[in-house]
Amino acid sequence: MRNDLKLLPWEICSEADGWNDEFLESVFFLGNGRMGVRGYLPFEPDSRPTQQGLFLAGIFGEIKDGITDFVNLPSPVCETLLLNGTTAVLASPIHRTLDLKSASFYADFTLAAGDTRADVRYTRFFPKELPALLMQRFEIHVQSDAELELRSGINLSSCNSPIPDDQVKENTELVQLAPLQFVTDDGSLFSCTFETVGTGLRIEQEVQFHAPEFTQGIVQNSGAEVTCPLTAHAAAGQTLVVEKLVCIRTSRDADERIAAAPGDWSFHALWGAHTVAWSHTWQNCDRTLPDEELQIGLRYSMFQLMASCAAHDPTVSIGARGLTHARYKGCYFWDTDLFMLPFFLKNDKTAAKNLCLYRANALDAARDHAKKMNAAGARYPWMAALDGSEQCETWDIGCSEVHITADVAYALGEYCRETGDEEFYLHKAAPVF
């Protein structure tokens, strides 16, 4: 059992050696409900295609006809630092902090190339009310005069490793489900466009920098990553700052708040609006407990629910591992209807309604599934994803889970009872009942 986490009322902290720690990367997950990334870091020299990526609600690609997997998308957490022309490597422990109050992730560490050292403070957040954006900030403090080159962009190597529903089978296959289609570079920003295999969903990641002390170079595509070089001279004791905005939009966006990247943006202004939004959220749902460990445990659990729920999108639900992993194909299970929905019924009725709308709008797929099972009416599937059809491939699990329809009906009934939403009852819930 790991005991190397420091638990505070609003923060989880750790100090560890080395880049690769899958346990910590799970703990330090960050998201805004629409999309999220695990707690991996920029500057890691080794590529880990299945562990480094970004998950975005509703983005599925086909691994076989009619069967999808939750796409591990190319990652915009992709940086390399050169000091005096030499690639810098990790030269200290890494201190990570997840601040639940502001839904922010920080990391502090030192990079070195020969005798040249740079202390790095890294910040990451997903603006709560601007769900298309990912913000990152790099504060690089050099201990001696140095020529800096920061190569920043998008890691193209992210892959899925589909795990068979028959768990006696091994999963050794790597599949890239969102290959690069093209790169656009207009000098001040660049974008990469991807398309999912089989489902044909388009994803655009646009990257912009605020780096007044750096010179921005020409975008380069190595095949493994698309990066832009930023170069600068730093005097001993100087701290240089790079701010990176990534705007991610898709061909299936349903949340009306999703918009193009702002033409004129301020990291601090976006940060301020983000913290205010989370402050309002916590004022509504926070509960205080006398025990510190129980307190952070409760807040962490609530944060995970909110960070994994696309509250304004009625076309998706909360997957088996939220936005952290493609296990179980990223499918939606009855756990959301019975165990997660009650939190949203009490704290975010918009989210609760949209979780229920996902099920109600999948009624036709449930009817089709009932016919395939030689049954009357509707039968909701064990594993659901993009269109509500059954995604489970083994008869001994999917065919035997007969309680799902009752779970869905119960959840819709609880929403109607809690909210008194007559329109939803008449037009959405009643046909299911």
Segment roles from a protein language model:
Residues 138, 205-207, 409-412, 429-432:
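Conserved short hydrophobic patches within well-ordered secondary structure
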Residues 270-417:
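Substrate-binding groove/exosite segments of carbohydrate-active enzymes
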Residues 1-328:
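Acidic/polar, glycine-enriched structural segments that form the non-catalytic walls/loops
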Residues 129, 414, 418-424, 428-431:
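A conserved hydrophobic secondary-structure block that centers on an alpha-helix together
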Residues 121, 151-152, 317, 353-358, ...:
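Beta-strand segments within the central parallel beta-sheet cores of soluble alpha/beta enzyme folds
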Residues 130-133, 224-226, 331-337, 425, ...:
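Short, glycine/acidic-rich beta->alpha junctions
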